[in-house]
């Protein structure tokens, strides 16, 4: 199973790239973790946000064909590390790749929300989207380590 993190936004600060890559490189070969960056639509004072969201959503959905789609969204379901480890095992047994979607400044398009099979809430707080990349990478790595009895996760 391959895990794809599909996120709106490119040219992240160096600390975001380094933080994400620190956890990305730790994933096992049989579970590659890939970042796909979707260019953010141009926002300005008179920007058509609805159109921008629609374009970003189409690009995100085209990047995750035939994958299990999971959105990262505040109204989603919060998972403990143990619950995330169980989800990870269930996803592996499903036989499909997993696409985790992180929206841009205005969130996810209605099309992305409609296509999702699961919605995961990291926190009731609104988190900066660049930071979410690192939190998701670490959380998934921790869940993998728990499910494989790797010493990274300690209770």
Curated annotation (Swiss-Prot):
Belongs to the RNA methyltransferase RlmH family. One of its GO terms (cellular component) is cytoplasm. It is found in: Cytoplasm. Transmembrane segments: none annotated. Its EC number is 2.1.1.177. It is an enzyme of class 2 (transferase). One of its GO terms (molecular function) is rRNA (pseudouridine-N3-)-methyltransferase activity. InterPro entries: Alpha/beta_knot_MTases, RlmH-like, tRNA_m1G_MTases_N. This is Ribosomal RNA large subunit methyltransferase H. It comes from the Bacteria. Its main location: cytoplasm. PANTHER family: METHYLTRANSFERASE, RIBOSOMAL RNA LARGE SUBUNIT METHYLTRANSFERASE H.
């Amino acid at each position: 199973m391959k895990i794809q993190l599909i996120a709106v936004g490119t040219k992240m600060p160096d600390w975001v790239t380094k933080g994400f890559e620190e956890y990305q490189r730790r994933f096992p070969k049989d579970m590659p973790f890939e970042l796909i960056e979707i260019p953010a639509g141009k926002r300005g004072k008179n920007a058509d946000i609805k159109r921008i969201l629609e374009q970003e959503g189409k690009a995100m959905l085209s990047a995750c064909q035939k994958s299990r789609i999971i959105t990262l969204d505040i109204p989603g379901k919060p998972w403990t590390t143990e619950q995330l480890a169980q989800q990870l095992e269930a996803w592996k047994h499903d036989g499909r790749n997993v696409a985790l979607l992180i929206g841009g400044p205005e969130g996810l398009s209605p099309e992305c929300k409609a296509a999702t099979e699961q919605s995961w809430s990291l926190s009731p707080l609104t988190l900066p989207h660049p930071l979410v990349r690192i939190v998701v990478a670490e959380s998934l790595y921790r869940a993998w380590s728990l499910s494989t009895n790797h010493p990274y996760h300690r209770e």
